[in-house]
Amino acid sequence: MSRVCQVTGKRPVTGNNRSHARNATKRRFLPNLQTHRFWVESEKRFVKLRLTAKGMRIIDKKGIDTVLADIRARGENV
């Protein structure tokens, strides 16, 4: 499973580790992904999403039904 948020689309980005001597080595910055089950009242079932902490805040703000409609409009299966 790829490390991509289903709500925000955030994915890993690359950058550098920097030592005290300022030597650069490549590294990846990973999103804060969590797997979370949400109860969808309109469908009378749980939906499991893989999303970032920011994605959870978006669901708190907009509601699970609106966010699921956006995800399905993008063609993702949920």
From Swiss-Prot:
Assigned keywords, A-Z: Ribonucleoprotein, Ribosomal protein
GO MF: structural constituent of ribosome
SUPFAM superfamilies noted in UniProt: L28p-like (SSF143800)
Protein name: Large ribosomal subunit protein bL28
GO biological processes: translation
Segments for region (Disordered): 1-20
Gene that this polypeptide is encoded by: rpmB
Entry's family note: Belongs to the bacterial ribosomal protein bL28 family.
Species name: Vibrio parahaemolyticus serotype O3:K6 (strain RIMD 2210633)
Domain of life: Bacteria
Recorded GO CC terms: cytosolic large ribosomal subunit
Pfam family, one: Ribosomal_L28
